[in-house]
């Protein structure tokens, strides 16, 4: 109930509401708008740096996972979204949870929001800023008594599944791509060597042997282009 913090929240939510009304945003889109704002603040962490007040995070335009998650929690709870801080003690990481209808994080009633970078609501952090990944179960710290939930969990789950599938396909194709790259490099080297030989023949006036190599050169180039277009 610090007046300085409340003034900040009123100022920010006032601007967000103007955007919501002018763009005709749904409640889910409004949550995503506020989330994107907090994610856009520069990530910065300092050794032995105590948690900032939300007003400090906004004025500095930066903060670590604790600072940004607490700022987002304050904003969303004041806009009637049911939220909780997700504190990962083992990994020294904090994120935000928002009550949702789908795509819930582990065994919680919240979907995950990563505040340290741009990501969709519901998609957990991959590799943490300091390295490693989230393995432990979070300590859940509810904020406020709001009731509104996020209802686009199924959509973000579909986005996440599509992304994971594309990553898997890329991984499966990687050996084939490397093999093709090696084959093309070998063919390019043969063409380069032949062109060097042909230049030598031309320079020495050996036109007959030069002409004999033209069809060979053209065949190598044709094969290279065919492989390249596959």
Question: Where on the chain are the PLM-derived regions?
Answer:
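A structural boundary/capping signal
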Residues: 1-230
